[in-house]
């Protein structure tokens, strides 16, 4: 344990915390432009083709981001809003796109967790009604 005299001379060492989303630069979200939209296979026990995009952010950094939800309308040069928070089974993906903002459409027919996927309240019921009319 340090003596009072040692603390006066040097002080306590500050603990540095590493950010999990350094490309955001301390901001909660960042705007960016899609440069590439692809799919990616997840890690070992899972199996699918997860939708991923490469995005150039407004601060000049390029990051790989996950596109959540079923289906999307993104293509090259689409403007997107991203936030921190990766996907457990996709290595190197530490950001995700916010659905329902800028050029990104919300998920159609979504009933639960609508705010996460940019789905409007009545849209799910209208989609279900349209499906039943087709049958």
From Swiss-Prot:
CDD domains: Ribosomal_S12. The keyword rRNA-binding applies. It comes from the Bacteria. One of its GO terms (molecular function) is tRNA binding. Part of the 30S ribosomal subunit. Contacts proteins S8 and S17. May interact with IF1 in the 30S initiation complex. Residues 124-135 have a biased composition (Low complexity). Residues 114-135 are annotated as: Disordered. This is Small ribosomal subunit protein uS12. Belongs to the universal ribosomal protein uS12 family. The keyword rRNA-binding applies. GO terms for biological process: translation. With S4 and S5 plays an important role in translational accuracy. It holds the Pfam family Ribosom_S12_S23. Gene3D superfamilies: Nucleic acid-binding proteins. The modification 3-methylthioaspartic acid is found at residue 89. GO terms for cellular component: small ribosomal subunit. Keywords: Methylation, Ribonucleoprotein, Ribosomal protein, RNA-binding, rRNA-binding, tRNA-binding. InterPro entries: NA-bd_OB-fold, Ribosomal_uS12, Ribosomal_uS12_bac.
